[in-house]
């Protein structure tokens, strides 16, 4: 039911193309995955999302547990039917909220007690509970519960959190019983190579359908992020899909692909879109700026997204300056399409054996726009 098929390999790097087969369709990798935290990519309908070329989205277990609740989603027929998205869905475990809501939680080896940011009540999540929630949601891919520590934690604290992550992985595997849902484990270990290696080997030993690398892009320096991207894949199984969590910049994606990663997610396309910022090549355009008032060109004349085919920078500037919701939607749509197009172009370059010429971030200060 779940299979990862490697379809081509780069001759100079570890980059590869593949097909991740799921019960709700296939994901052609490398692929960017938009974030739909509450079973919605903010401001965008499922039909609009399909137009961007998106093949898989991410939703958040913790937030869906709080509202509307996994039982209601299950009663509706599962998350795909609930949100009218027929393609694959991955649900993260809530491990990131262990990091992002650190001031509102208490952590023990049994799980995490959160203070509900909505009403102040307390919610306890154990690895077993997190898996049960994801089984009720009915996602294609469930993530094992993990402890994502802050990048400022010292090595001893990182090691303690890693042991907890590994213990929770064991419990997650023992609890997960849904044959039509894949379970991925998560590699942690902070910026410490020995801990990353240990975690990668331990997580790989479970022979799960896929594997993720977490604890990246949580405040580290660019150099530290690149170190993890370069180092960890050598300890991961080659024939499994590799998911690098929280990465969405062109340079980091291309570097990650060169090291054998396949799937990526990030909130930036929609977060920036909601603030009027559009992706253009490897730059960002703040369309609130007055210089776009009389600019009747599209965001990107080479882009075939619905926004760029139909609307000018001047019109988008007008919408954003007047706080019109349509502006946020149109820019977010473009930003998602931009990253999907980028990963699609990487796939083509790998198949044509020109990936290192067109997308190698270590060879140029910017990624050549004409290549995609």
Swiss-Prot record:
> InterPro entries per the record?
ArchSynthase1/Queuine_TRR, TGT, TGT-like_sf, tRNA_ribo_trans-like
State the reactions this protein catalyses.
7-aminomethyl-7-carbaguanine + guanosine(34) in tRNA = 7-aminomethyl-7-carbaguanosine(34) in tRNA + guanine
State a GO cellular component annotated for this protein: cytosol
Query: What EC class does the entry list?
Result: transferase
Q: How does it assemble?
A: Homodimer. Within each dimer, one monomer is responsible for RNA recognition and catalysis, while the other monomer binds to the replacement base PreQ1.
Pathway(s) served: tRNA modification; tRNA-queuosine biosynthesis
Q: Where is this region: RNA binding?
A: 246-252, 270-274
Pfam families registered for this protein in UniProt: TGT
* Gene name of the encoded protein: tgt
Q: Where does substrate bind?
A: 92-96, 146, 188, 215
* Co-factor: note: Binds 1 zinc ion per subunit.
The reply on keyword Zinc is yes
- What molecular functions are annotated in GO for this chain? metal ion binding; tRNA-guanosine(34) queuine transglycosylase activity
Q: Which family does it belong to?
A: Belongs to the queuine tRNA-ribosyltransferase family.
**What cofactors does this protein use?**
Zn(2+)
Protein name per its UniProtKB record: Queuine tRNA-ribosyltransferase
Q: Which HAMAP family match?
A: Q_tRNA_Tgt (MF_00168)
């Amino acid at each position: 039911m779940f299979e990862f098929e490697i379809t081509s390999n780069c001759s100079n790097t570890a980059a590869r193309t593949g097909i991740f087969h799921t019960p709700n369709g296939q994901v052609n990798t490398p692929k960017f995955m938009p974030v739909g935290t509450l079973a919605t990519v903010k401001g965008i309908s499922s039909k609009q999302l399909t137009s961007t070329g998106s093949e898989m989205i991410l939703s958040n277990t913790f937030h869906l547990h709080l509202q509307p609740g996994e039982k209601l989603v299950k009663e509706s027929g599962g998350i795909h039917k609930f949100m009218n998205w027929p393609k694959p869905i991955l649900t993260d475990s809530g491990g990131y909220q262990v990091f992002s809501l650190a001031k509102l939680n208490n952590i023990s080896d049994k799980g995490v007690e959160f203070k509900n940011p909505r009403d102040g009540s307390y919610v306890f999540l154990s690895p077993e509970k997190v898996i049960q929630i994801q089984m009720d949601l009915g996602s294609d891919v469930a993530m094992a519960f993990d402890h994502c520590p802050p990048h400022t934690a010292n090595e001893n604290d990182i090691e303690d959190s890693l042991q907890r992550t590994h213990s929770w992985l064991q419990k997650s595997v023992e609890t997960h019983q849904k044959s039509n849902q894949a379970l991925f484990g998560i590699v942690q270990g902070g910026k410490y190579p020995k801990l990353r290696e240990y975690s990668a080997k331990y997580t790989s030993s479970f022979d799960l359908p896929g594997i993720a690398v977490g604890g990246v892009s949580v405040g580290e320096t660019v150099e530290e992020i690149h170190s993890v991207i370069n180092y960890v894949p050598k300890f991961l199984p080659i024939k499994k899909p590799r998911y690098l969590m929280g990465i969405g910049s062109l340079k980091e994606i291309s570097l990650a692909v060169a090291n054998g990663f396949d799937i990526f997610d990030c909130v930036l396309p929609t977060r920036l879109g909601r603030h009027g910022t559009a992706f253009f090549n490897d730059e960002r355009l703040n369309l609130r700026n007055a210089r776009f008032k009389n600019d009747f060109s599209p965001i990107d004349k080479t882009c075939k997204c619905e926004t760029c085919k139909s609307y000018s920078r001047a019109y988008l500037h007008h919408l954003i300056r007047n706080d019109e919701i349509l502006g946020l939607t149109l820019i977010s749509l473009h930003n998602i399409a931009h990253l999907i197009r980028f990963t699609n172009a990487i796939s083509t370059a790998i198949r044509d054996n020109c990936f290192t010429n067109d997308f190698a971030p270590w060879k140029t200060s910017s990624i050549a726009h004409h290549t995609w």
